[in-house]
Amino acid sequence: MAAALQRKCVLHWGSLDFYPNLYVVLVAPSGKARKGTAMIPGLKLLKEVGIKLASNSVTRQALIRDLKRSNETEIDPTTGSMDIHASLTVFSKEFTVFLGFHNNELMSDLTDWYDCDDDWEYRTKHEGIDDIKGVWVNIIGATTPDLIQSAMPLDAIGGGLTSRMIFVYEQRKGKTVHTPFYTDDEIALRQKLVYDLEKIRMLKGDFHVSKD
């Protein structure tokens, strides 16, 4: 849902603006739970709806390039003003490969992007300064406890990037599905999900907390 909403929707909360981006990482011991398998149906839905995704294997520079190329212009339905946003979803079944080993520069960028700054400046390969308007990054990834420890420096655990992440841990599979085929009802439900995501993707503007 966050991938469909992008940076087009916002909740103003006092002096703060909240956008619907999440950093979610599925964690389980290797071979004990099917993390990547659980993610595949979601990936297919996002591609079917046309959500912009980061490249599968990227360097920091390529990721920044993907983010910059994802920019779109939207008209605010409330004010009529023109807004530019660069919304990109990272979908990585091997999240620690995506992060790299102690890649402090990329981890610092991801920490910055979580806050969805209006302008994000960076130094280019040829030492120039460029910027991206309306940064918005959304992440769903998967890894193992051991790989988290090896990929991240100790001082990153519990603060910085990891404090912005939601780690979903599972020790083992809940059950084994011997015949993983959709029933007619599930196929119909999937089509409804695609329809809902397409409608959600069209939403834009300010959201408000209801009095209820």
Predicted regions and their residues:
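Phosphate-handling catalytic cores of nucleic-acid transaction enzymes
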Residues: 1-212
